[in-house]
A protein has these predicted regions:
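Catalytic-core regions of glycoside hydrolase
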Residues: 1-199
Length: 199
């Protein structure tokens, strides 16, 4: 999986490009977040094209899978609409690689319904996306109908977008490698028997 481009640039971008329309992102866990280009600007297209060209020069033509999360664990949209953002990110990705598949992490509030709706604006957009339900063994997002679940799309299974059942056994300072065995024993068979869009 290669890196996808969603507009991240260095915080000092204006030292190199005075015309870049950006949104400062502040901090995440005391680390400075990268600045984001506005996807509505012509600068975004220019930088996306350059990013994919340079990445191909470095790695070669090795993959059609690209991971990027524009506002993972927060971030500031600066008034931009999430549907517009995802439409533009996917459009530029497909422009660079007609067979591109955008790998999207389902974590916390991501992907939002608006982000998923933006995929639908691109021809066969959901065919160019694959969602990783990162903590599916404990907190599945594909099953939005369960009690207490947040909505991840207007329709079932991330708006009928292909997705993967993932297990995240070690994160956030948890040093032991273990799983939720009762959930695994029950949920994995349920997923394969009751879902339609698992990849």
């Amino acid at each position: 999986v290669l890196q996808g481009y969603s507009g991240m640039v260095p915080t000092n971008i204006h030292d190199y490009d005075k015309n870049a329309e950006v949104i400062e992102q502040g901090e995440w866990c005391s680390f400075q977040r990268p600045t984001m280009l506005k996807t509505t600007s012509s600068t975004f297209e220019k930088y996306a094209k350059k990013f994919y060209q340079c990445q191909k020069e470095v790695y070669g033509d090795v993959s059609n899978y690209y991971a990027t999360d524009p506002f993972h664990e927060g971030g500031i949209t600066g008034g931009m609409n999430a549907s517009d953002i995802s439409e533009k990110v996917l459009t530029e990705m497909i422009t660079a690689d007609k067979d591109a598949v955008w790998i999207i992490q389902s974590w916390q509030g991501n992907p939002t319904t608006a982000l998923l709706n933006g995929l639908d604006r691109v021809e066969k957009g959901t065919d160019h996306a694959l969602i990783l339900d990162l903590y599916a063994e404990k907190d599945p997002h594909y099953d939005e109908g369960r009690p207490g679940a947040e909505a991840y799309g207007d329709e079932e299974e991330f708006d009928k977008t292909p997705w993967l059942f993932c297990m995240l056994n070690n994160f956030g300072g948890r040093l032991g490698l273990h799983g939720h065995l009762d959930n695994l024993a029950n949920n994995i068979p349920k997923v394969f028997n009751e879902t339609k869009y698992i990849a």
